[in-house]
Regions:
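NAD(P)-dependent Rossmann-like dehydrogenase/reductase catalytic/cofactor-binding core
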Residues: 5, 9-27, 33-37, 41-149
Length: 149
């Protein structure tokens, strides 16, 4: 479940690349934590919600969303026209970008189980990263979900 933080970090990075404020980014991180918990509880037995409020949960998520390589690369993606492979090559010095791989795997899982609608942030991040949806579309998500959370 720890890999899901990298997907959320893509969303946080889109916020940074667009120059959005801290409140928007914090809203994305908050929604992301909720979707991480829901995903793990939906698909893995024995998951305890309190785990997400420990160092391995929220603390790791915050660190990744505010300083990790997935955030950094997503910021570059949102800021201007490079493909993921170019960004990875130019910014990571041989390291791999895990968030994009995990994002694709998560979406494959959700589609196969008919659960995409239950994970609007994961779906939006996938749309931006792989389906050509503009990064600016991340901005409308927190307001659209406020009545559901």
């Amino acid at each position: 479940c720890g890999a899901l933080k990298n997907v959320v970090a893509l969303g946080a990075g889109f916020c940074d690349g667009l120059g959005l404020g801290g409140n928007t980014k914090a809203a994305i991180v908050r929604i992301g934590l909720g979707e991480m918990e829901r995903f793990c509880c939906d698909f893995f037995s024995g998951v305890q919600s309190r785990t997400f409020f420990q160092s391995c949960g929220i603390a790791d998520l915050i660190t990744t969303c505010y300083g990790g390589r997935n955030r950094k690369c997503a910021a570059a993606f949102a800021a201007g026209g490079q493909a993921w492979a170019e960004i990875e090559r130019d910014l990571l010095n041989g390291q791999k970008l895990q968030g994009t791989i995990t994002c694709q795997d998560v979406m494959t899982c959700l589609v196969a189980r008919g659960r995409v609608g239950h994970y609007p942030l994961f779906a939006r991040i996938h749309e931006i990263a792989f389906q050509g949806k503009p990064p600016q579309s991340i901005v409308t998500l927190p307001a659209a979900l406020s009545s559901r959370l």
